[in-house]
């Protein structure tokens, strides 16, 4: 049932105040090389912006395509969760001294990821062609969750194997 999935979705909810970040902040300040900081900084700056684009997709396009109340509730909840994640990453970026948005615009790798994501989002528009909608959902989900976020999480987890960024 849609309502059961909605409940599970809300039970997975977290706020930045529930995620311990202090040990990672200390690692950043004391244990990471400038190369490691550059890698992690690029990922974190990208996360904050990616979450914003993903929010736009769920709340703008998906809610337009599917007018069923349960799907609208799911999509707006997804969008709301993305704003919470974006806030968490923004606060972490600020704490690490990565809060200058113009730096994000100068980071070619991060900017290219976001531009590709926005191109996928924008290429399908708001028309209700079910084949195009299915294609959009598949590509957008695979790119954002698969290629962009999970590959970045894999890089971050590799630091944990080195006993860094354990939080």
Language model features with spans:
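Non-heme di-metal
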Residues: 1-167
